[in-house]
Amino acid sequence: MMEIKHYESQEIIKVNYFWLRDHCRCLLCYNTETLQRKYNLLDIPRDIAPEKGGFKYLKDGKVLQVKWTDGHISDYDVDFIFSLQVEKFQSNKAKSTLKTPWNLPIVLQNERHIRFKLTDLIASDAVVKDYVSALIRYGIVFIDEVPASTAMTEMAIRRVFPVMKTFFGEMFTFTDAADHADTAYSKVYLGSHTDNTYFCDAAGVQALHCLSHVDGDGGDNFFVDGLHCALELKRRNPKAYDILTKVQVPAEYIEKGQHHTHSAPMIRVDPVTQEIIQMRLNVYDRAVFNTIPQSEMMEFYNSFCEFLEIVQSPESQWRFKLHPGTVVVFDNWRVYHGRYAYTGKRTMTGCYVQRTDYQSKARVLGIID
């Protein structure tokens, strides 16, 4: 281990020799055009260490130069080394205020921040950044004044994100016709859920647009912030929260030519920062539950039911009717959505966006790290 002192704060950290050698950014080790390492990790001796007296500070302590026992010389930016430590990473995540958990009163107070006109979105890159920032913060945004067609809905989404292709297609248009083995393809009540719980990598973002609803009524949509609900469960019952972050809940989708299955917790947390990174809930797609012993079942079901009480409470649910001309875009890893039963003929269109594309856009715009 090497002790490194910060030139301003005088803080001292200890870093592993091999890790330090692995993070050399000289032109022999790092391709500055592709931003990729250039060497085989096995090229570094396992017992790598600085030569005796082989390190010194340059440029008033801002640069650390190390002469290694394999003959390599590395110059390190001291701020760079300090910024890469796990404690710094955890601290930055803990202090992050990018996301605003919401219930009904909070989201209604902030609705003006999450509505965007299609013409403004097309005309201004600054509006695109505001749109993605709002989606990161609240998990839901609206694009207004979109002509009611699948083609125009696709254009509105592709202005910012590429569209994800699944067995539903890229853009999907649906009614109550049973085109797929899914409750969404019906007129019945559809409770709060996330899509694709049966995929190994569920869509990160979903978009929906009601193209028409004639000769009937009902069909109000509703949205629930799963992040708020999870934090509320953690406050009320930390043990129940812990159970839902650990128990693997199986999901399954079966129709002719398709059989998808995946198991994961209902609340997924980052193992390093403990930050909530994905909410996963779909009572319709739950498969046979065989991932924990029977002796633990009741404790899980009690936790599950307590969580559902929060999710289904009136204060958590934002209910409204989608009309032609408004596209709702929401974070499928955070926000639950559902629909009340309806009569008549209702036509919806929509699509998915991969999580990695969503986050890539946010990084390119400088919104997240």
Question: Language-model segments: which ranges?
Answer:
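Active-site environment of non-heme Fe oxygenases that use a 2-His-1-carboxylate facial triad
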Residues: 99-140, 145-329, 333-369
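Motif-centric detector for short Cys/His coordination patterns
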Residues: 1-123
